[in-house]
């Protein structure tokens, strides 16, 4: 796991106009994590077009532009491990989520189908599949989903390890 950047470090990195191949799968930066404190909207477009997952830490103006927001750096190691072990799948997932944000439901389902078929034919999925059923996951009496509806926002939280 790389050390998360401050917002100033993140801004400086982007100001140097790095090539997109320096981020995402097959690069030293399969993801970028930065502290949202002090952030402004100046990097919104870059974040929206980046090839890798963008992880915001804490609170700040760019919170809604990040692919994932965590409360603090304690949550980063597991996320970092998963992205680093599955960089193509991570990239496909964030690109899917970004694309479907602006599409109609029927078109979103088509794009989702393409994304999942791409992942399921990939080497990461083929390596993961034989391991899937070997680990017995704990069962919970809690509901499988937590659904929270507030104003125009709908949050659906998966509550199962499998």
Positions of PLM-derived features:
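C-terminal alpha-helix plus adjacent terminal tail
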Residues: 1-152
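Short, proline-centered helix/strand-breaking motifs
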Residues: 53, 161-162
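Terminal peptide-recognition signature
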Residues: 93, 156, 160
